[in-house]
Design a protein with these regions (language model features):
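Sec/Tat signal peptide C-region and signal peptidase I cleavage site
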Residues: 27-33
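N-terminal secretory signal peptides
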Residues: 1-9, 13-26
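C-terminal lobe and pocket-closing loops
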Residues: 131, 217-285, 317
Length: 331
């Protein structure tokens, strides 16, 4: 007489159904990642053409485009320290074809202003591309030749000096406010919609100083049109070995590092996020790309979505606390 184990058969059937269901859930994402991308990709930059973020995006677009096999279109959407660009990306389809290429203010905007969106829920990190210290630059005709001379001048003439920023809440803004606090100087904030117009007015002598990123500031320092007084990193820049850090002047905790990274709309398939992140990581590891970046005073990063998330959490914690403690505003 043949005995049938109905319990075992039922369990095997249930497991088979579960396995098929899991496979069915994975296959569409895998297929989507394999098919992605099949049309041009748009990178939205929150600042004006010609500034540091714009230049960095365009530099990275070429190798990433080759790796993905599709053209990359860089679109500038300046205004409100990145808010307008972020909104445009959030409202785009969550398919990986529209990314935000943002920078330092992303981590402090939620502390500085009331936003019409949640930057930590409506956007997801893809990859941090680069890091770079700022360079404190002044017009070549400025009366002060060194960092300490500028501080002495500022202390002797309270409120006379002003400083440019590429937008409220950016690294140039917070670096200047940190210096106000640490060095005891009084100077006036003049915000611009991007680094390019800030540099233009600095060259014309319309503003006293600017914590420029290397992309926009370094060429003018090297040509003698601007004077570099200090840099904001933990160590001297390879591209400017003779320019001291702010730390070297006795401000041992002073460090401000600009960064650029990619974000996608929430809901973008993880497989697509991973594909995009891998392309950025691979591009920043290419010897020729690294050589160009380092020569511009930039540190290539290229990390995973989770590593970028961890970095952002640290930035939000540090700068959020500082903004609140020192009552820094967007004004």
């Amino acid at each position: 007489m043949k005995t049938t184990n109905h319990g075992c058969t039922a369990r095997r059937t249930a497991l088979a159904v579960l396995g098929a269901g899991a496979l069915a859930a994975v296959l569409p994402q895998a297929a989507q990642a394999q098919a992605f991308p099949n049309k041009p990709i748009r990178w939205v930059v929150p600042y004006a053409a010609g500034g540091g973020a714009d230049a960095n995006a365009r530099l990275l677009a070429q190798p990433v485009s080759v790796l993905l096999g599709q053209p990359i279109v860089v679109e500038n959407k300046p205004g409100a320290s990145g808010v307008l660009a972020a909104q445009a990306v959030i409202q785009a389809p969550a398919d990986g074809y529209t990314l935000l290429f943002d920078t330092f203010p992303y981590a402090v905007n939620a502390v500085l202003r009331k936003l019409p969106f949640d930057p930590f829920k409506d956007l997801v990190p893809v990859s941090q591309a680069i890091n770079m210290p700022n360079i404190l630059v002044v017009p070549a005709a400025a009366p002060y030749k060194t960092f300490e001379e500028m501080l002495d001048y500022a202390r002797a003439h309270p409120g006379k000096l002003d400083y440019a920023s590429y937008g409220a809440g950016g690294s140039a803004h917070l670096a200047a406010e940190l210096l106000r606090r640490d060095a005891g100087i009084d100077w006036v904030h003049v915000p611009y919609k991007g680094g390019a117009p800030a540099i233009t007015d600095l060259l014309a002598g319309q503003v006293s100083a600017y914590f420029a990123n290397p992309v926009s500031g370094l060429p003018y320092v090297q040509s003698g049109k601007l004077r570099a007084l200090a840099t904001t990193g933990a160590r001297r820049m390879e591209a400017l070995p003779d320019v001291p850090t702010v730390r070297e002047s006795g401000y041992k905790d002073f460090e401000v590092v600009e960064w650029n990274g990619f974000f996608a709309p929430a809901g973008t398939p993880q497989a697509v996020i991973d594909r995009l992140s891998s392309a950025v990581q691979e591009a920043t590891r290419q010897p020729e790309v690294r050589k160009r970046l380092v020569g511009m005073g930039i540190e290539p990063v290229g990390n995973s979505p989770q590593e970028f998330r961890t970095f952002l959490d640290g930035q939000i914690s540090r700068w959020g606390a500082l903004v609140k403690a020192n009552r820094i505003t967007v004004d």
